[in-house]
Amino acid sequence: FGKRIGKDITIQSLRQEYDAVLISIGASTDKKLGIEGEQAEGVISAVSFLRDVGKDKSPDLTGQEVAVIGGGNVSMDAVRTAKRLGAKKVSIVYRRRTADMTALPAEIEGAVAEGIEVLTLKAPSRIETDENGHVSGIYVTPQMISKIKDGRASVCPTGEEDFLIPCQTLIVAIGQDIESEHFAEAGVPVSRGKIMTERYGGFDNIPGVFAGGDCASGPASVIKAIAAAKVVAANIDEYLGFHHIISCDVEIPEPRLSDREPCGRVELTEREACSRVCDFEGVENCMTEAEAKQESHRCLRCDHFGYGIFK
């Protein structure tokens, strides 16, 4: 615990000490914009910003203009959080179209309803700073839709002049990365921010070493990380020469669906945008008692009939 690969310990030494090694470091670092001025005061990563808010170390954004670079779910979390921290104006800056954003449509709609400005087809070019080295704005290059590449519309500059978007805080949310340097030095294949495993989660050139989760798949959901862990655990078990079968100490009945009538899902309502931006309470309203009872009857009892963790 508390050891750093490449500094305190190496993959080779771990491999000599253990029969198998699993790399599951997640994707905890942020991708950089790679533009002038990125080291200025007031330029922060979305992950560190949201982590601080979660630790009750929220920055005071009262009266500020805040810009967030990116179009994913993390950027939506960042803009909506900034609004709740008192920012006067919050803008999303994205180099593609709204339709190309990877954020859930409901998140985008929620942000717009809360007064977030969405600036699309704007590619960051450089960061402007004041005399104290603090961010004062970001210059962007207008973009236009271009050729289709890999099934997705690419963008290219329109030829118009760059213009400045004023901001006193700039949050970068263009994706997450892994600390790959020391793994690459150890012979672990790394490409474009991911550890490149074989289909079984291991490496042909480094027997006994495996990787799984966000560091191998790229940033994903918690449930996908859990699923990846189950797969790689089974593969490590087989690599070690075992074929353990996970079982439970209860008798699992045969699935039965004959007593389940099809029923639509309850659609939750949301609090008014003007009200919810003032606090960090839930956006969705609770179900009524009748709705909760109806929704509970839709449960297929996967836990009881041998699915989920018992599968």
What are these regions (language model features)?
Residues F1-I35, R126-Y139, M144-K147, T169-I171, ...:
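Feature captures the FAD/FMN-dependent oxidoreductase FAD-binding
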Residues G115, A123-T129, H134-V135, S146, ...:
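Mid-to-C-terminal Rossmann-like scaffold of FAD/NAD(P)H-dependent oxidoreductases
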Residues G212-I246:
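A conserved FAD-binding loop/helix module that cradles the flavin
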Residues Q39-G63, I148-P219:
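FAD-site-proximal beta/loop scaffold in flavoenzymes
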Residues V79-R126, H244-D259:
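Rossmann-like dinucleotide-binding cores of NAD(P)H-dependent redox enzymes
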Residues K57-A87:
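Rossmann-like NAD(P)H-binding beta-loop-alpha module
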Residues F1, E38-V53, A103-N132, G137-Q143, ...:
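N-terminal glycine-rich dinucleotide-binding loop that anchors FAD/FMN and/or NAD(P) in oxidoreductases
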Residues F1-D52, P207, E289, K293-K311:
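Glycine/serine-rich phosphate-binding loop and adjoining beta1-alpha1 elements at the start
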